[in-house]
C-alpha cells in the first residue's frame, strides 16, 4: 500500500498546493489521520489545516457544535486546525445575511478556540455587500470572491428525471 509520501514524491513534486476535502466531521478526519505520518514528514510550517464552516448546515449550526466538531477533527486526524474559513451559504438562496451570521458565529468560535479566521468566501455580489459593512478584518481574513458559472435549476432538473 502506498502512502501520501509515495504519491507526493512521484506526482506532486512540482505542486505548490494539495487540497484534501475530508468532509468536516470525525469520519473524514479519521480518513485524513491515515496520512498523519506522511504529513509529519513535510517541512515544518508547510501544512495548513482549515475548517471550512457553513453555519447553515445542521452539524455546524451553533458555536458549541462547531467547537465540538473541531475538537473531534483534531483528535481523529491527529492534526491541528490552523485556520477557519467562513463559507456560510444557502447555494442560490444566499443573501448577505448568510455571511453576516457566519461572521458573528465564527468570530465567537475563534475567540474561544484561538483558531484564526483565514478566509471568508462568498458569491462576489454578497461578499462585496458584506465587506462594505465594516466588520472586524481579524474575523474575516482574506476575502475570496466566488463567481458561479454553472447554475442548476433543481426543480427543472428533477422534473427532467421523471419525464
Regions flagged by a language model, labelled:
Residues 7, 83, 119, 142-145:
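Generic structural signal for residues positioned in beta-strands
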Residues 130-163:
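N-terminal regions of ATP-driven nucleic-acid and macromolecular assemblies
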Residues 22:
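Walker B catalytic acidic pair
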Residues 1-8:
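Short, small-residue-biased leader/transition segments that mark boundaries at the very start
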Residues 14-18, 48:
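Loop/turn-to-beta-strand initiation segments
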Residues 26-138, 153:
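Conserved catalytic-core segment of NTP-binding enzymes
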Amino acid at each position: 500500500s502506498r502512502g501520501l509520501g509515495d504519491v507526493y514524491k512521484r506526482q506532486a513534486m512540482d505542486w505548490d498546493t494539495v487540497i484534501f476535502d475530508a468532509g468536516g466531521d470525525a469520519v473524514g478526519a479519521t480518513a485524513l489521520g491515515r496520512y498523519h505520518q506522511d504529513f509529519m514528514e513535510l517541512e515544518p510550517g508547510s501544512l495548513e489545516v482549515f475548517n471550512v464552516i457553513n453555519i447553515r448546515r445542521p452539524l455546524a449550526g451553533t458555536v458549541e457544535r462547531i467547537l465540538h466538531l473541531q475538537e473531534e477533527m483534531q483528535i481523529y486526524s491527529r492534526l491541528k486546525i490552523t485556520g477557519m474559513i467562513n463559507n456560510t451559504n444557502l447555494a442560490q438562496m444566499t443573501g448577505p445575511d448568510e455571511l453576516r451570521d457566519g461572521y458573528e458565529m465564527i468570530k465567537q468560535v475563534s475567540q474561544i478556540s484561538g483558531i484564526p479566521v483565514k478566509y471568508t468566501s462568498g458569491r462576489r455580489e454578497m461578499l462585496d455587500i458584506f465587506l462594505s459593512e465594516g466588520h472586524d478584518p481579524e474575523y474575516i481574513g482574506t476575502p475570496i470572491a466566488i463567481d458561479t458559472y454553472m447554475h442548476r435549476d433543481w426543480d427543472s432538473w428533477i422534473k427532467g428525471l421523471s419525464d
